[in-house]
Curated annotation (Swiss-Prot):
Its main location: membrane. PANTHER family: DISULFIDE FORMATION PROTEIN-RELATED, SPBETA PROPHAGE-DERIVED DISULFIDE BOND FORMATION PROTEIN B. Disulfide bonds join 36-39, 96-101. Belongs to the DsbB family. BdbC subfamily. Gene3D superfamilies: DsbB-like (1.20.1550.10). The keyword Chaperone applies. One of its GO terms (cellular component) is plasma membrane. One of its GO terms (molecular function) is protein-disulfide reductase activity. It comes from Chlamydia pneumoniae. This is Probable disulfide formation protein. Signal peptide: none annotated. InterPro entries: DiS_bond_form_DsbB/BdbC, Disulphide_bond_form_BdbC, DsbB-like_sf. The chain crosses the membrane at residues 7-26, 41-60, 67-84, 109-131. The lineage of its organism: Bacteria, Pseudomonadati, Chlamydiota, Chlamydiia, Chlamydiales.
Length: 136
């Protein structure tokens, strides 16, 4: 099983980043949910991953993980920080604009958007670490 995951880790990471990008765009432009500043930072980390992971999966080039792993770890850190903002009472961020970074918006009735982001970035990071070496 682990060999299967390692063999297709780039494809799985790409699929997760595509799903995250599509859900983010859906919430912003279809449901008109205005993102907070931390959500924008997470998008800055996520959106390029979709393109880069797609190209590297197509080319079976796992050496790209050296360049995109820090970006995924940064996105994970930002999303963990936002979960703390939402879950720890009294924590507030001064840079939040019109939309508070601690406002909870739920996916599937029980998972907040930042928690879904933690899961997505965490899975991408794990998959990049497990990626089978193809070239290089």
């Amino acid at each position: 099983m682990i060999n299967f995951i390692r063999s297709y880790a780039l494809y799985f990471a790409w699929a997760i980043s595509c799903a995250g990008t599509l859900i983010s765009i859906f919430y912003s432009y279809i449901l008109n949910v205005e993102p907070c500043i931390l959500c924008y930072y997470q998008r800055i980390c996520l959106f390029p991953l979709t393109v880069i992971l797609g190209i590297s999966a197509y080319r079976e080039d796992s050496s790209i993980k050296l360049y995109i792993l820090p970006q995924a770890v940064l996105g994970l850190g930002i999303s963990i920080y936002q979960v703390f903002l939402q879950e720890i009472p009294g924590m507030q961020l001064d840079i939040c604009g019109r939309v508070s970074c601690s406002t909870k918006i739920f996916l599937f009735s029980y998972v907040t958007i930042p928690m879904a982001s933690v899961v997505a970035f965490g899975a991408i990071v794990c998959l990049l670490v497990l990626t089978k070496k193809y070239r290089g």
